[in-house]
Amino acid sequence: LQSVLKIINDNITNKDLTPRYIADRLAISPRSLYRKMEEIGEDSPTDLIKECRLHIAKDLLLTTKKTIDEIVFDSGFSNKVTFFKVFREKYELRMKHLEEVRQ
C-alpha cells in the first residue's frame, strides 16, 4: 500500500494517473493491483486516487487563498464539473457555501 500511495502522491497532478498507470509503475497488471488492494481491505485504486485528490483540495481550500480553478488543477482533477461533483458527494457541501465560508 505504501508504494501505491507514494506513486499517487508523486503524480497527483498528472491527469494520466489511473490504476493502469500505478500498475505499470509496480510492474503488475491492473487486475493484480485491484486484487491486492482488495486482499488488504483497501478501497479500489480509483477510489484511493479520488480520496487523495479530495484531501489535497480540501486542504488547499482551507489553508490557502488560491482560486477554485487553481485548486482544481493543483489537486489533479481534470475539470471543475468533476471536482464539484465528487467534492459534494464526499463532503455534502456545495462550492457556493464553501466559498462563502472562505471569505
Q: Residue spans of the language-model regions?
A:
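Extended, amphipathic alpha-helices with heptad-repeat/coiled-coil or helix-bundle character
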Residues: 24-25, 34-40
